[in-house]
Regions:
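N-terminal pre-domain/capping segments
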Residues: 1-112
Length: 112
């Protein structure tokens, strides 16, 4: 029994999922470990839209790929350091806030 060969999509979050899926198939991968940033996978949308997950499966299926994991670890990297402007690139907009700069997530995360 062989293990599937998968690609983690986080390093390519600047590419649309459909483009990355096409490339991954061409590179010989069996499936993807999908990042929850870029347009690859939105957990909130998955909870609110009954058809959203199927659209992700359909994109991968078009290229004969499967989902093997979903990654949410990027936002967790913001918890150890003092939050500053560098974190804006890794925090989702609802955590970063509405233009409050680093003070927005500091305040929000302090009460969670």
């Amino acid at each position: 029994m062989s293990s599937p060969i998968t690609l983690f999509t986080g390093q390519w979050a600047d590419l649309p999922l459909v483009k990355l899926a096409e490339l991954a198939k061409g590179w010989g991968y069996d499936g993807l470990e999908i990042a929850c940033w870029g347009d690859h996978f939105d957990p909130d949308k998955a909870l609110s839209d009954d058809k959203y997950c199927q659209t992700r499966h359909d994109i991968l299926g078009k290229f004969g790929l499967k989902v093997f994991a979903i990654s949410t670890h990027l936002v967790g990297q913001a918890v150890c350091d003092v939050i500053d402007e560098r974190h804006k690139r890794i925090l989702p907009p609802n955590v970063w806030g509405d233009g409050d700069g680093p003070e927005g997530p500091r305040t929000l995360l302090a009460f969670r």
